[in-house]
Amino acid sequence: MEKKMRAADEAADCPVAFVTGASSGFGMLASVKLAEQGYRVIATMRATSRPEALTELAAARGVESRLVVRRADVTDAASIQAAVAYALGTYGRIDLLVNNAGYAQGGYVEEVTMEQWRAQFETNVFGAIAAAKAVLPHMRDQGRGTIINIGSISGRIAFPGYAPYAASKFAIEGFSESLRLEMKPYGVHVVLIEPGSYPTNIWEKGFASIALDDASPYRNCLERILRFSRQSASSKADPWEVANLIARIAADKRPRFRYPIGSGTRLLLAAKTLLPWTLIEKLVLRLLR
């Protein structure tokens, strides 16, 4: 009896993480890494009928008991609120939100439909806002918490052919800056991770969203962009780097605001800061020849 009570007390003392987009990529790896670090993890995904990749990885690393898979569609505020209510009802706390759900819509601006533009922002921007709004009252009341928004290097420098994705990540930059300043007085840290290219599913979905129409005036340009993007996405960069960074930030009592990560990201940021825009244009367009 005493052992059971002690185990219950220990469970109550465990920090709780709420992760969106946990079915694959950074969200899946971060969920497992946080569980390894001692978190109780609410790993959410839009379709809970396909959690196998996450549950198999968690079992292989011996942390399946620390993970709970819940449905949460970030484009449905009620779905997010229900998952947050479950977390609070079960564990009584949420210490960390990892806003990871998202995808990359590709295509030239003229050819991306308004429906595709809106869908990109519904998931990447409004979904992140909805998740933050759902946890903020609790974090503010408890006087602590961390929100990690997964941005992108595309939120700092935009490339042709991915305007919807870049625009959504630029929006996350502004949202995160403002929210960081709003919540600082309440003990809630807002952090922005800006990954470069990693071999995750987000890019495969992005490539699939680009339709190469023979009649398109942009066909040749899009073919070059796809070729360059596939080369970048097939790099040997390890997505566990991002999961490990998330875990380190979660453990940091005073995390900084921005964390660019990945091969070449700091060089790109330095180039955009130091070089004249006309030179950046020439370099990018030459790269895509």
Residues of each region from the PLM?
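Residue(s) in the substrate-gating loop at a strand-loop-helix junction
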Residues: 152
